Amino acid sequence: WSADSKDYKPGDQAWYTHFRIGRVAPERYEGSQFPEGDAAQNQFFRQMTTNTGDFDQAVAAAALGEVMKDVQTLTGHKSIFVTHSQGGAVGWNVPADNIAAIVAIEPGGTPAIGSEQYTKLLSAGIPIAIYFGDYIDNGPEDIMSTSFWRQVRDGALAFAAQYNADGGDCTVVDLPKIGITGNSHFM
């Protein structure tokens, strides 16, 4: 086997669909803001990486906590911590001491209500904003990713309701519901 004889398209296609760009590459959902054309497709597929092994969220969270500490030392201010997708899981676990707020863009989930992460965020008084893009409510019913993203968004809404009821400050922004359409998982 040579590298030239392998076809990686099926795996790429799964992410294209899961990230709600379109049903099948190179098709885009109607109204999509994802750029048209071969060059855009090429760049999208280039960002795919192979499985590089286990991912230790605790190590990543501790490292980012050190970065937040350094930022506060250098600036005198806590940071607004922005996460996206799988990075959301890391963000919920970063030590809260040096974080002013969290902005989570389509995190793959939220902390379980009552969990250590939930309690840490609530106790620290960290305000949270969670954003979701388009093609969740209007995505194809026969694609598993559509129901996955609905469940993630519904979980975020439940998290926000309880976080707010417990005295926290969490807002979930569903971009299409405020008139901002055409955004996929990448916004």
PLM region descriptions:
Residues 1-30, 137-149:
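Short, surface-exposed "cap/lid" segments of acyl-processing enzymes
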Residues 40-56:
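Short glycine/proline- and acidic residue-enriched helix-loop micro-motifs
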Residues 57-79:
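Conserved acidic catalytic loop of the alpha/beta-hydrolase fold
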Residues 81-82, 102:
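Conserved alpha/beta-hydrolase fold motif
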Residues 82-91:
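Gly/Ala-rich beta-loop-alpha elbow adjacent to hydrolase catalytic centers
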Residues 94-95:
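Aromatic pocket-lining residues of Rossmann-like dinucleotide-binding sites
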Residues 101-175:
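The feature captures the conserved acid-bearing segment of alpha/beta-hydrolase catalytic domains
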Residues 170-187:
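C-terminal catalytic histidine-bearing segment of alpha/beta-hydrolase fold enzymes
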